[in-house]
Amino acid sequence: MSKHRNAAVDRDRLPFVAPCRKLSLWAPFRWIRLGVADLIHAPQQSLVYGLAVAVLIGAVSLVAWFRGSQWIMFGMLGGFVFLAPLTCVGLYAISAQLERGQEPVLTRSLRAAFKRHIGNEAVFALVLLVIFLVWSRAAVIVTAVMYPTDGDPTTTELISFLAFGSGVGAIFAAVTFSASAFSLPMIMHRDVDSVTAIVTSVNAVLRNKGAMIVWLAIIIFALALGVITAFVGLIVLIPVIGYATWHGYEETIDASEFPRHSEGITATPRPSASSTMEHDPVI
């Protein structure tokens, strides 16, 4: 595919948001199954990537623990649930290679994921970074203001603290998760800007609240399981979640009206793109 194809696209005629498909409540479990299949087909690349992310999350958590408190650490771990798309971008490229019958190469995946789309990804990362920093600061403030410091806290005081902290976190979580659920896969898949990708993601989440709540619960469960296993479980769980996110994007978002990238892994369609799964009508 030449670069002239994308140059000829009249971007003023492109829709502001890509339509989405209506998902069944159990669709996220199908994404997980496909994610496990990708892990099996690319075990070495997946585990190396998962190890790197697990070490990063573990290191940040330890710093938060020793320099702050366990409550700050839990707040930062909550933030990782919604920053996960940034850490999984390279995994999307591995899934895309597998779909096209290519042997996945980790260096090529990282180059395709970051170097080719660095502009839009940098804007998206900056937005998430600001939200994450505000979230982290909010966790510190909530701990300082709400956590009882006089003697042993009562059950009522602890419940009040946890309820208030959870409410504050839920506000940040809802906004960030909606914006990040499908944004980065779309940026890597099609030649779109960050605003279009974010609005498309929010639209898809709002129109599929049930399925996305299930998906969010799966992500939180995976992170909790990773923490319980001293972050060792994340070595496997991060790749599965990353691959599942890519398949979830492909099942949910109809980005066919937007141009493909002129070069790179996703410049060409996957051979069986029209027959791999039955899609519901777009909404």
Language-model features, listed with the residues they occupy:
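Hydrophobic alpha-helical membrane segments
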Residues: 1-283
